[in-house]
Amino acid sequence: MNRLLLVIDVQNDFINEHTKNTLTKIKELVDSNKYDLTAFTRFINDENSIWYKKLNYKGCITKEGQSIAIDTKNNKVFDKTVYTAVNDALKNYIRENNISEIYLCGFDTDACIQKTAIDLFEQNYDVYVLKDYCMSHAGKEIHDFYIDNLARLIGNDRII
């Protein structure tokens, strides 16, 4: 059985004063080869999305903004247009690679990390959130609140 490091949305448009230090830590974690497999997600936005139309969110529209901010080292990248990374492509990857544990890191704790962690947990995957390798571009206070919320929703032992 393999352990997967799933790096969520470490993209140029999510890098700011709140996330830049966490980005450095994530890069070091990816470079450590501590996990059997590493995969990345990339949020893709456009003018027809609900994010653009309903929230006036214009991030991750350009190729530069969508670009992953660290070297993916030719690991698998899953494109997504919603908060969660859980879709058929990811589930097939998990099954095909005999993955038993999934470790999440990346951005934003309050959105894509939370939604992905809950979705994996609800579908009975063994999921863990690496709290020191996640952050919200809205700041540490938001990050901490959602880490506490995730501990309540998926179990304190799954926040490491």
Model feature map: region roles:
Residues 18-45:
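A short alpha/beta connector and helix-capping loop motif
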Residues 12, 43-48:
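Short active-site-proximal "capping" loops at secondary-structure junctions
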Residues 6-8:
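Short hydrophobic beta-strand that contains or immediately precedes a catalytic carboxylate
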Residues 10-18:
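Short acidic, Gly/Ser-rich segments with clustered Asp/Glu that frequently serve as metal-coordination loops
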Residues 46-58:
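A short secondary-structure junction motif
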Residues 1-4, 13, 31-37, 57-160:
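Active-site-adjacent betaalpha module
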